[in-house]
Amino acid sequence: MKAILYVIVAVIALILGGAAGVAGGYYWFERESRKKLNSAEARARHIVDEALREAEAKKKEAILEAKEEVHRLRTEAERELKERRAELQRLERRVLQKEEQLDRKVEQLERKEETLSRKERELDRKNQQAQELVNKQMAELERISQLTMEEARELFLKQVEQEARADAAKLIREIDAEARENAEKRARELVGLAVQRVAADHSSELTVTVVSLPNDEMKGRIIGREGRNIRTLETLTGVDLIIDDTPEAVVLSAFDPVRREVAKIALQKLIQDGRIHPARIEEMVEKAQKEVEARIREEGDAACFELGIHNLHPELVKLLGRLKFRTSYGQNVLKHSIEVAHLAGIMAAELGVNVEVAKRAGLLHDIGKAVDHEIEGSHVAIGVSLLRRYKEHPDVIHAMECHHGDVEPRSVEAHLVAAADAISAARPGARRETLETYIKRLEKLEALADSFDGVDKSYAIQAGREIRVMVKPEKIDDYAALKLTKEIARKIEEELEYPGQIRVVVVRETRAVEYAR
């Protein structure tokens, strides 16, 4: 019984303890929940406050950025407005200037119109006076000579015709003199501009080359046993080796500069190598030929590069390089061709014609001289054949074939190439001429002028660039002097060969002498 009671008491105590525990747990849970709720509310308020502060800061920042953007846009708008105002002001000034120019032109036209009207009235008045004078003269003639109206008209017309012929001749002389003066002035300006823009070397090419030797013993080694070395070298190169008493030197003589250059290079290589025998000579000559061929190609390419000429056939480039080793009256032909191309190009640019055609024709105008010793014919005919073979432009071929006057020029470029060729050949120091040849040329020029009837004396001056002809005044009048000048110039062109141009001056002098006693 007691056990049951204890159990009941224990159960009751357990129930009461559980109830108390539940009540205590509930109280503790409620208190903790309240704490957490309060903490969460505090954090929420803090977050809200932070968000409000950040929103306020961002709002202020956005307002500030908006103000800055508005300021920037306003500044740009003001700058654009200022630029547009300035542009409008410039346009207004230009319009005002145009209006002023138009006003001035209108005033000029009005003045010209007034001048023309005045001149027209004056001309009408003079025509009327002339007609009145004619009528008066006709009446006077008829009265004095008792001529009929028809006879007086014929006499008057003859008189007017004579006066008109005299006036026409005078006018022709004045126009001719003015045209010549203007043409010569323009030509001098053009040639002077071209010449001063082209720097060219003076020429002093010879037909011999001197090779220096380290010592005179080398001469014997060059000659070789029984002369076999020198014979081999002469046979392979086609050059004459002159070994004389000149100390430490051997002279190479040949008409063909290419052969002379090959022999020079081969001999220099042999001297440097020291082994001189026929087999070695053949080897060195072959190397020298290849070296000269390469140099010829380089010279042709360099000439084209200097002038800015492109798409030239490789064979023509090679032939241009060969001109480096050709001379004409002592003038290097390649340098002469480059100079002619420069001069023709400059004059073509000044005249506004095709510069490319002028320069190309100037460079190629003497291309025939590269092979004229191998092919029969003049260098002009050979050059034309070469240019046609390698498909050069017809305008270039025409300008090239006209440079010696063999063909009548049909283009401005052809005239320019001929003029440039004459300028290059005639400039001081360009070409050498023996004294005997020079004197004969001047004597022939004077004899040609003396052959005309009425010529008293003639003098070739300015190194043959001018012929001054003194005529007999009783045989040659002023009109005949003008005609004689043209005839002498035409005969010089037909019978003489000369570089550049020759000025013909005819001088007629009349002297009246009387003595007072």
From Swiss-Prot:
UniProt KW Nuclease keyword: yes
Hydrolase among keywords: yes
TM segment ranges: 3-23
Domain KH: 207-292
A Pfam family the protein falls into: RNase_Y_N
Keywords from the named record: Cell membrane, Endonuclease, Hydrolase, Membrane, Nuclease, RNA-binding, Transmembrane, Transmembrane helix
Location(s), subcellular: Cell membrane
E.C. no: 3.1.-.-
PROSITE patterns with a match to the protein in the record: HD, KH_TYPE_1
Family from the record: Belongs to the RNase Y family.
Record function comment: Endoribonuclease that initiates mRNA decay.
Record-given protein name: Ribonuclease Y
Gene giving rise to this polypeptide: rny
